[in-house]
Curated annotation (Swiss-Prot):
It is found in: Cytoplasm. Zn(2+) 5 binds at C865, C868, C884, C887. Zn(2+) 6 binds at C892, C895, C910, H919. InterPro entries: Bbox1_RNF31-like, BRcat_RBR_RNF31-like, IBR_dom, PUB-like_dom_sf, PUB_domain, Rcat_RBR_RNF31-like, RNF31-like, RNF31-UBA. One of its GO terms (molecular function) is ubiquitin-protein transferase activity. The gene is Rnf31. This is E3 ubiquitin-protein ligase RNF31. Zn(2+) 3 binds at C793, C796, C811, C814. The record marks D384, A385 as: Cleavage. Its EC number is 2.3.2.31.
Amino acid sequence: MPGDEERGFLAAREELASALRWDSAQVFPLEQLMPLLATSLPPAARYLQLDAGRLVRCNAHGEPRNYLNTLSTALNILEKYGRNLLSPQRPRYWRSVKFNNPVFRSTVDAVQGGRDVLRLYGYTEERPDGLSFPEGQEEPDEYQVAVVTLEVLLLRTELSLLLQNTHPRQNALDQLLRESVEDGMLQLSEFHPLLREIVPGPRPSAQGSTPGPCFLCGSAPGTLHCPACNQVSCPACDILFHGHPSRAHHLRQALPGSHQTASLSSSLPASSQPRPPSSSLALGDSSLSSPDPANACLPWHCLTCATLNEPWAVFCAVCSQPKGCKVPGIEGSHGTGGLEPEPARDQWACQSCTFENEAAAVLCAICERPRLAQPPSLVVDSHDAGVCQQSLKQEDPLLTAAQPQVWYCDHCTFCNSGPVWVCAMCNRTRDPIPTQPALQSYPSSLEKGRPKPGSSQHLGSSLPASCGDPEKQRQDKMRKEGLQLVSMIQEGETAGASPEEVFSALQYSGTEVPLQWLRSELSYVLEMVAELAGQQDPELGAFSCQEARKAWLDRHGNLDEAVEECVRARRRKVHELQSLGFGPKEGSLQALFQHGGDVARALTELQRQRLEPFHQRLWDRDPEPTPCWDGLDRQSLVRRLLAVYTLPSWGRAELALALLQETPRNYELLDVVEAVRHSQDRAFLRRLLAQECAVCGWALPRNRMQALISCECTICPECFRQHFTIALKEKHITDMVCPACGRPDLTDDAQLLSYFSTLDIQLRESLDPDAYALFHKKLTEAVLMRDPKFLWCAQCSFGFIYEREQLEATCPQCHQTFCVRCKRQWEEQHRGRSCEDFQNWKRTNDPEYQAQGLAMYLQENGIDCPKCKFSYALARGGCMHFHCTQCRHQFCSGCYNAFYAKNKCPDPNCKVKKSLHGHHPRDCLFYLRDWTAARLQKLLQDNNVMFNTEPPAGTRAVPGGGCRVMEQKEVHSGFRDEACGKETPPGYAGLCQAHYKEYLVSLINAHSLDPATLYEVEELETATIRYLHLAPQPADGEDLPAYQARLLQKLREEVPLGQSIARRRK
């Protein structure tokens, strides 16, 4: 039965796993993880899925801090893989993990057992380029992923505490390293894949046995063993092979019996790599084909030129042909010059290392050079050839035991050090001619075994001729690679990437698509650089991605050098800030992290923090008291004004002080300063500082007053706010004019736009938000009413835009249908008929219409506003001056001509311009209402127009008698619609006298009859003076009828009754 401690551990573990499943981005504080880390349970009981002890032991090579850092970094990446699988929005390619991912290669794949952690996540299907989920599995097992992710998180936290020496159990590392095999085997069934990978491979030969040859060159003895690659190599080939970024973190160990005495890290110093001793050389042609490893370290004869070469040489020292290669046409001492058999069709031989690769391989499996790569150039520098010839002649015995430690590459002129044969810059093999001093030890054998190859002069002259084509190929290849690099840089600049970023991406990853790599992988690399830099020197704090990016670009993508550069740069910046008085305790590390390593911005932030108390005291203090302007030290007051308020000159400061010292002191300091900046005229300044409000008479400085663009009136802020607030809430939009002079005239469309555009800015700063919103609403309605497509509903007085051409319109508010022209309620009988025909049909066939009599006729011929087209079902009796409630337009209800206010009439000859008036045509009800009914009837009879003198048939009488025309009457409770009720004389068709005259005048206007035909001479003279502004006089000898006929003709010709009347344009 499990104990209490184990049960508590399992319960806490399940709780954290459930929280991780619920929120994959959950960050567990150290206090929450500490109970799981401080338990006394062994690792096998704490890590049920992950074999943590074996994972640590199999990667424990070298210093504990180094391999714990490497393992912690790999676990951090593995934890991110698990969190991505638990996230609701997983990455696009979550189903597979690619081995060529640079972050994966340099972190997870650099430790033993990393891939099997991925298999625990569910990546169980092997692919040639990586791992993936099985095809039939649609979703990952969330419980399994959560448990494994939690154990990875716990192990990473435990390693971090060990690195910081803060682990609650001091023997935690010993527990992980010394766990017995029996405890590890308890979990063999659960974690069998991990055991298979992390069990170390077989070591090379035991102590005392002869090491095998290098797996790369096959000549030099292997002295180093790489457990990750399970290969043995010589020091020179080890530097070349493990210089690749994917193998840079492999740990190598010296083989027993070799000259290496300690395990080697990923970077081996050149001075510590021994050369094979010259005493091991032995002559004999049989050694070339001996399969015995002991004989593999013997010198070999070139099959082309028969030159004896050292055992570790890959190319011939004279003809530069690979080992075992025959060239037709050149016969050696051991061959006939025949062609060497070609490789099989399913294989190809590498031109650099002669390894035979599979036909489908693009890169060599040994040296990773491309299939079409040319062999190293055979051009020999003249200086090196001369040194070689001189060495051959002198036969210095010291050269047999000494190897030059510094040599220059013939291709890139890079200075290499140590006994390496491959250039560290361009990966070209060094020229073997000057590195063959061992040949001087066997002159007799060389002379007896083969013919002499010729003198040194012959060698120097024959090489350029035989190597011309390879040199041209090398130059062509360099040109092609350069053009490819330029093309990639241009493509990167087009996409926004700098040339340094493209080049660094190529150097780091070797990818052919650097832009795609920069978008997908650069962020992970920068995070790794920042994390490694922080682990290298924790005292420097956290590193930002901007610092990591700069260091990575400066070091052209070299990860290790970028980490070193990042640390060096941070140390330099911290020292610079510390010299300025801001050390780590003052927050310099945090400031550098926040501002991406920018010293200037970090210094600004630190200075701001240091000045924050001063600013706080400055603003928290009470307002500074106003100085006494009557002080004895006048010069001090002037200097204070000049300095604090930045006045333009000393004279302006004295003028401001003089105004402040005047009595009575009605001026404010800021008002005086503002006024003095604009002028130095004292009289003008006094007027500027004491502007009188045109409404209330309050005196204020000019800069506090409000003014409209339509007039020169100055209004104080309080009057301005109250006037426009009342106008908005209780009046029309056209009443928002100057409260003092009443300008501008908002009936003019040209003034309307410019006035309201400026007034909008002033009202925004003066009115309350509710009043300002009401202003915008009313202004919008006023603009819509000016649209020619705007239409008022005849039933509910709702306005809307009607863009159709049909006469039948439906109101969107009350959904009633009416005629667009005559405003009558739409009936099916109106379809296909004009409005006049429909009205005649209703008079004849509609009983309700007939029952109303002539009152319905007057109601249908109500008042329509000529500006906004709003209809009023009112009779025209009473005052003819009508004020529209919708648009505030003033007009005559009889002729629809406008009424003009004082001094607003556009007629220059108008004699009543200084009063409210209107200009009416002679057939307007304004004049004809003074005629008697009999005279109006005579005008209709003279023109054969029928009219009613009795109520139409079927008309119902009003209870109590009286006129039936509906009127709006004012009562105590408001307005009420009711019948006129006045007395109806006989012969007036059931109407009162006023409404009967209105009925007759409407017939006269409908038939365009001219009442001037019934004018007397006095009426003709009055009409001539009114419309023609002339005082007519009878001609000499002209009788009265002729004079009357002449005035009538003149009036009808010069003042006709046509379409100029607004009523007829309705």
